[in-house]
């Protein structure tokens, strides 16, 4: 069975594991998912990620980050652009998540960037997700 929206599946797995206070979460890997994981790591939402060879395909494993008394680093995740309704933003009209406290992940011609990086480079693109 094919998956209609692998990014939404990734975000749902991370959200569910985060809410259940799991230490790690695994999922099928792709270049796009690995790039999203890299952005989450750069922004401090996860500890680390690894891509491992499985019997069939590759597996992406994220190590979730918690502070002090198991307080979650990720308060929320939201898929913005969906297969049925794509959402694009110009470089002059990029969204800010919670007034700059969160991160918008944007797919641009220069690869996946955060909203701040895209603003600095002056590029727009498809708004994939919000993380706060």
From Swiss-Prot:
One of its GO terms (cellular component) is ribonucleoprotein complex. GO terms for biological process: translation. GO terms for molecular function: rRNA binding; structural constituent of ribosome. It comes from the Bacteria. Pfam families: Ribosomal_S8. Part of the 30S ribosomal subunit. Contacts proteins S5 and S12. One of the primary rRNA binding proteins, it binds directly to 16S rRNA central domain where it helps coordinate assembly of the platform of the 30S subunit. This is Small ribosomal subunit protein uS8. It comes from Corynebacterium efficiens (strain DSM 44549 / YS-314 / AJ 12310 / JCM 11189 / NBRC 100395).
């Amino acid at each position: 069975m094919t998956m209609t929206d692998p990014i939404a599946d990734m975000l749902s797995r991370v959200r569910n594991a985060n809410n259940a206070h799991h230490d790690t979460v695994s999922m099928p890997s792709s270049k796009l998912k690995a790039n999203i994981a890299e952005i989450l790591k750069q922004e401090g939402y996860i500890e680390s990620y690894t891509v491992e060879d499985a019997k069939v395909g590759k597996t992406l494993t994220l190590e979730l980050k918690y502070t002090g008394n198991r307080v979650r680093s990720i308060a929320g995740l939201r898929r913005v652009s969906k297969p049925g309704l794509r959402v694009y933003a110009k470089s002059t009209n990029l969204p800010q998540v919670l007034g700059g406290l969160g991160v918008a992940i944007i797919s641009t011609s220069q690869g996946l960037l955060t909203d701040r990086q895209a603003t600095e480079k002056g590029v727009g693109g498809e708004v994939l997700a919000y993380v706060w």
